[in-house]
Each structure stands twice: as C-alpha cells, then as structure tokens.
Regions:
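A surface-exposed partner-binding patch
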Residues: 1-69, 158-171
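Generic structural signal for hydrophobic core residues of well-folded globular domains
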Residues: 8, 65, 106-109, 122
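Short, solvent-exposed secondary-structure capping/transition elements
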Residues: 10-14, 114-119
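Short amphipathic alpha-helix initiation/capping segments at coil-to-helix junctions
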Residues: 64, 76, 92-95
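Short, surface-exposed beta-strand/loop micro-motifs that present aromatic residues
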Residues: 69-76
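Long, low-complexity acidic/proline-rich regions
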Residues: 78-81
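Compact, glycine/acidic-enriched structural inserts
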Residues: 83-117
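Charge-dense, low-complexity intrinsically disordered regions
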Residues: 116, 122-171
Length: 171
C-alpha cells in the first residue's frame, strides 16, 4: 500500500454512460493523509454504543466510491491489511482482499458502481464453486451491467483474479 502512495497519493475518477444514465462508476482512492485522518461525522458520530464506537474509530476510508458506502480498513495494532465494505448505517463486511488485490480487481470493473458487492458474495462463508455465478438478485443485475457497460468484462476472469489475490482465510 505504501508503495502505491509513494508513487500516486490517491486518485479520483468518475464516469457516466451518458448524461441521462444511471449507469455510472466512481473511484475515489483517498490521499494517505486523508485515509489516516479523523472520520468522525462520516464513519461515526460519537453517540453510538461504546464497543461499536471504539471499533469504528479505527476504520479508515480508502475508496469513497459513493456518498453512502465506502471501502476501508481497520487501523489497529494487529495491522490486518484486509479491506472492508461499509454501507453507512450498517456494519462492515470483509472483502477478502488487501489494497493491492483491490486495485487488481478494480481494473476489471473500471469502478462500476457497487462492483464491490461481487466481493461480498465471493467472500461469503460457504466456499463458492467454480465456475461461479451470482446468487443474489442485486449481484446478478450488477454482473449484467458490468457485461453490458464495461468493455471486455468477463465474470470468470474476474473470479479467477479474485481467487489469485484473495487473502488466506484464518484457520
């Protein structure tokens, strides 16, 4: 992660299929000084239950891809590199990848809106079979959109890349 930020301290790209379209994508990899800054009033507000608040005060946004959701990491003494999906107002969900793996998968999707949901289904506790096909209706729609709007998107190539960059699961 540090090598990336030595070369490029964050980047922002957004796109829309056309002016009237809901088909869009966004990547907002925050500069490192923002990642490790204070996320009060965005990630947490200070009035939440103590255990949840203590945990979320360590959550640092890495990709602020939507106003209501992001991908980040927990900056703790354990130094676990795994990224997590956070839909504001709910809990975080592990994605099974570190920053380098996330960037590799991002390249397949061009930041298509909510592509991270594919990772949530791939990271599900039950091992997925290969070839993999999404089970959730929302993920099925996402794959259809990716195939239609992201040139050359291949679901099985994406899954193979995920398998290659996926962090080992703790025993």
């Amino acid at each position: 992660m540090l090598n990336f930020f030595r070369l490029r301290n964050g980047f922002y790209v957004s796109w829309r299929a056309d002016a009237n379209s809901q088909i869009e994508g966004k990547v907002d990899i925050r500069p490192i000084q923002h990642i490790y800054g204070d996320w009060k009033d965005i990630v947490y507000f200070g009035h939440e239950p103590a255990a949840w608040l203590a945990r979320m005060q360590t959550f640092k946004i890495v990709d602020f891809f939507a106003d209501e959701a992001c991908v980040g990491l927990f900056h703790t003494a354990a130094q676990n590199p795994e990224l997590h999906y956070y839909d504001f107002g709910s809990d975080t969900s592990p994605l099974g990848v570190d920053f380098q793996g996330y960037l590799a998968l991002l390249a397949h999707t061009l930041g298509y809106r909510y592509w991270q949901l594919l990772l949530l289904e791939l990271e599900a506790p039950t091992p997925a079979t290969r070839p993999w096909h999404p089970q959730r209706p929302q993920t099925q729609e996402l794959v259809q959109g990716l195939q239609q709007y992201v040139p050359g998107f291949d679901l099985q190539a994406f899954v193979a890349r995920y398998d290659a960059v996926r962090l080992p699961t703790p025993a």
